[in-house]
Amino acid sequence: MIIDWKAHILPGLDRKCDSHVKAIQLMIYAKRAGVDKLVAMPFYEAGTDLRQFIEMRDEAFASVRGLVGEDMPELMLGTEFKYDKQILDTDGVELLKETPVLLVDFGGKLPSDEELKALRDYFGDRLMVSDADTLSDEDKLRLTGLGFQSVVDLSEIRHSKDIKKLLPFVESGFVRGFGGDKLAGRDPYRHLEKTKRRMGEGFEKLCKKLC
């Protein structure tokens, strides 16, 4: 099974998806590329009304889910946010906690272990790291030791050596999957198709280890 953990398919919330027509196109492209499941991943901006964001997010997700046909990938709901010390004190954070999948962006710099533990304890296994590719191996080991998992951007997987570099973190359980956040263009899943063709069996083995 191939899962895109960072799908931008919610009109009104995702800049890369400005209409329901675009959402349908992206789902079709994803299925054509062999993606079995999409996790809709809008971004929550710290300091904005979290309750209002969640209400808009849920409405957008319901409208897109209503368009899903048998020939499209399965959908899940998620939310990504940039780490902020105040996130656990934000009004409505208990609603965010109910989201099936959460991604946190640390901005390339990890907070203290105490803050990381508080974040992990509150959100649990549903929370993963979205910017692990910007972190040092030492930071990745810190996060692994604290029970975090991560999603790697698909654009980071271009050659067999990239898979070889990832494998230790896949084996340790730190890397759980990938998404296409940095992929631009009309069809962000074209890179996935090219990667599958270029790497063949190596990419298939990686997907099996991730899933």
What is the predicted role of each segment?
Residues L135-C211:
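Charged catalytic cores and adjacent phosphate/nucleic-acid-binding surfaces used
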Residues H8-L10, F43, G78-D84, G107-K109, ...:
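Active-site beta-loop-alpha junctions enriched in small/polar residues
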Residues D4, A40, G78, L103, ...:
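Generic enzyme active-site microenvironment
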Residues I24-K31, R120, G124, T144, ...:
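A structural alpha-helix within SAM-dependent methyltransferase catalytic domains
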Residues L50-S150:
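Extended substrate/RNA-proximal surfaces in nucleic-acid metabolism proteins
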Residues S19-H20, S112, H159:
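A conditional alpha-helix N-cap/helix-loop micro-motif detector
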Residues M1-M72, L141:
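An N-terminally biased module of ancient metal coordination in phosphate/nucleic-acid-related enzymes
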Residues D4, D14-D18, D105, R176, ...:
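Acidic side chains
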